[in-house]
Amino acid sequence: MSAPLQVTVIAKSGGPLTKRISLATDGSLRSDGSACVMSRGTAKRFTFSRLEQFADLIEHFAPHQAICLGGLRSDLPDEVSVTTRQKLNGAREAGVIARTSEYLIFPPGKPALALVDHDTKGMPPSVAERIENLGGLLPALLSVLPALAGVARVVRCSTSAGLFRTDTGHSIAGSDGVHAYLIVKNGADGDRFLKTLHARCWLAGLGWLMVGAGGQLLERSIIDRVVGSPERLVFEGRPLLDPPLAQDQDSRRPLAIEGEALDTVAACPPLTPLEKAKLRELHAKEVMRLAPEAAKEKGAFIDWQASELAQRTGMDLRRAHRTIKRQCEGVLLPDVVLQFDDDDLAGTTVADVLADPARFEGATLADPLAGTEYGRCKARIMRRGDGTVWINSFAHGRTVYELKSDFRTAKTELEKAANDEAPETFVRLALTGDLGEDEVEELRNIAHRRTGINKRTLDNKLKSARQRAASEEARQVAERRTAERQDPRPQLPVPLSDAEWLPTMQAVNDVLGRNCATEPPTRNVDHCVALVRARRVPSLHFLTRKADDDTGS
């Protein structure tokens, strides 16, 4: 290693930051990760120049400690207090931060650690067989990322490795997961790198879909693609074990392997259009293969959850079925309970969040479908520029949930609105609610009766609002795609149709002119990029030579 690297050591106040593992009645392992959430504690800068120092750090972690691979911002002290984003509430208190990417960062162009997290959950036999045929996990990864062979890294087995029973001395098979911390040249490219590596694993036959609790299809591969953010907690503390379980600590001893820093862009470039097409084909085949199982799981989940919801709220079973069905489709209606990480928010519903979005913005919670069984702190409440509320979840990848009113809550709100506010309230509810056209029409009729405004006028008002919303959504989507762009290659803006094209084309020509590839871009005799024109040919007869035509050849 040359340049020193930095990570952040997180210490939780008042409890563990690791899993509790116990034995179930049938002798299998029961793992409880509900404590793996942090609302208060400290963050400490840790700088190291040798991988052995990092390995020693994580080997001796206590159960209340974890790491973030991003470093504290350079203007922050070496040790700070950590609180939640809600309690910080935008304040700039000295020595106090929230565990967000505002405070924990990967400086662009600077080396850092990137986590390759291997887990076999849901792995089908075909993928397991392929890994075995390739010679194991490392050869499988090398088949996708050959440059990994010479990369400096620290490798450690999962939290549940090396378990045994003290009463019998028998070993117990735990998780065969692995954490591999790679030194990369540009930590800021880590998120793109992991997502691309995940896609390339799919192309190599090392990816799969699994059916979730709600019948949703979850995308997996031999590496976790969503651990690339600088503020994400990585749990390395020893687990809490209930008797008679114990752990052989040597089985988890980190192994430091010296080598070079990985150039993630050169070693794992963005997918080509052909590769993207192949990836879509593989996904489609997996979706078709699992469709019957997914439908069965979804139906069972809806029946069970609808029964629970009807019993809790007293609503009729038909409405409860619709609520849970929409939840499976990514739309959360008012009666759905959200499982926030903050115990003070226990029992909070979607209706509570919609009534006071500012209070909940930024709050973390469990995935609305996977629940706390999958883990806490997997999702976050977000707000768009127009005020609409949504949930960004990173459980099993990335999932978006929309929080919306249903007809009953929309009708109640409209009837409570003042007469002069009814038209605007109607438009807002029609735009943001989960409503059918018949329900929108009924809301319009209520607004008409209360205000006396012509129905056609209300329809036109809603139509104009929908057009403005569609235009704004298109603009935001374009901006978001630009901001989230994973391709690290530079881009040039396309000139407008009536603008000057020569400066842009000259820039493209200069770049391509320096291409030294075996098969460089096609160029003409003047060494400029060749211009290719497509022409519609009415008949292949026109492509033959006249002499050939005359001879009948």
Language model features with spans:
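N-terminal nucleic-acid engagement/recognition segments and initiation subdomains in replication
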Residues: 1-99, 103, 123-128, 132-135, ...
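A generic structural motif
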Residues: 8-12, 40, 70-73, 150-159, ...
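Catalytic "initiation/cleavage/transfer" segments centered on a nucleophilic residue
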Residues: 47, 53, 62, 201-297
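Catalytic micro-motifs at enzyme active sites that drive phosphoryl/nucleotidyl and oxygen chemistry
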Residues: 98-106, 141-173, 220-225, 378-380
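Short, solvent-exposed loop/turn segments at the edges of secondary structure
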Residues: 109-111, 175-177, 229-231
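Active-site-flanking beta-strand signature of metal-NTP-handling nucleotidyl enzymes
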Residues: 111-119
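Histidine-centered divalent-metal-coordination microenvironment in nucleic-acid enzymes
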Residues: 116, 150-193, 233-236, 390-392, ...
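Helical (often loop-to-helix) elements that flank the catalytic cores of nucleotide-handling enzymes
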Residues: 126-146, 181-211, 246-247, 253-257
